[in-house]
């Protein structure tokens, strides 16, 4: 089984983690804060402009679980406002916990307050990552 460490639990890190877990990898997310989704907890905008197409492509490629959770917590769909067309807006106060439950339910190990401070290189490859508390992850796909 592959072991993968994902640095950062924002939308991209969560999506990458889900994909890796679905392919059979053992996955750890190192998140420096106390919650997932990062800046995704600020605006709550999903499926606007080009993101609509990207979302539908992601679903078609097997990434539906994350969007099913997002859709469940969407407050407004298909709205237009300056800079955004066809936007869906999810409830930023409610989305993080269900996403956390989803990834943990898939066997993904989420480690909060886990800041990566350094990487060790071997040539042009990452050999290990070092955490703020001194712990190192080695021999993983980073």
Could you say what each language-model-derived stretch is?
Residues 1-12:
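Beta1/beta-strand and adjacent pyrophosphate-binding region of the FAD-binding site
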Residues 25-26, 31-118, 122:
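Conserved N-terminal/central alpha/beta ligand/cofactor-binding core
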Residues 11-12, 34-35, 117, 134-136:
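Short, glycine-/Ser/Thr-/acidic-enriched flexible segments
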Residues 120-138:
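Conserved beta-strand-loop-beta-strand element in the redox core of flavoprotein oxidoreductases
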Residues 20:
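Aromatic pocket-lining residues of Rossmann-like dinucleotide-binding sites
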Residues 1-3, 113, 139:
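Phosphate-coordination loops involved in phosphoryl transfer and adenosine-cofactor binding
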């Amino acid at each position: 089984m592959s072991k993968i460490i994902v640095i950062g639990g924002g939308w991209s890190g969560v999506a990458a983690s889900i994909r890796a877990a679905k392919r059979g990898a053992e996955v750890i997310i190192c998140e420096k804060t106390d919650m997932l989704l990062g800046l995704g907890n600020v605006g709550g905008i999903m499926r606007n402009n080009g993101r609509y197409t990207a979302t539908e492509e992601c679903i078609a490629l097997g990434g539906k679980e994350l969007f099913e959770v997002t859709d469940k917590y969407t407050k407004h769909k298909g709205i237009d406002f300056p800079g955004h067309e066809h936007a869906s807006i999810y409830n930023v106060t409610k989305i993080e916990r269900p996403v956390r439950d989803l990834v943990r339910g898939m066997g993904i190990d989420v480690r909060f307050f886990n800041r990566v401070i350094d990487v060790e290189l071997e040539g042009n490859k990452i050999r290990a990552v070092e955490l703020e508390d001194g712990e190192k992850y080695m021999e993983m796909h980073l």
